[in-house]
Amino acid sequence: MIMNEDYVSLEVARLLKEKGFDSHYSTHFYKNNKLECYIEDRKKYWLQKDEYAAPTLYMAQKWLRETKNIHIDVYRNAGGWLYNLTKADNGTLIAEGKSLGPNNGRSSDTYEEVLCAGILYALRRNNHEWRCQIERIDQSVQRNRL
């Protein structure tokens, strides 16, 4: 049985493919908008144009951290689960996410939902926009050191 909450959503899977995620690390994929498991030998299988790798949330989070220098920090407070995006190499805050807990008008309140939302937010951002924002943060840190 596939535990859907452990895997990225179809929307995230599409964006991961667009951003260059290596599908060979994933054992699940979306085909015809349905989450499926690979049956044949993984090394011989290549995703078709309309298929998307569906890695676990952790795999997607790790990929963002290692390839884009973006860490998704999920935490809980009285309002529910939240996320922040930080630079993976030094913890500098890049963006704050919104609370997705029931105290803020949502019906669900899970760590996995918020982690998926953070991954989606990070992937939706324009690469140029990220670079500009990170450069401003780095310049600010350098000024503060002087």
Enumerate the language-model features and the residues they cover:
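Glycine-rich anion-binding surface patch
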Residues: 1-146
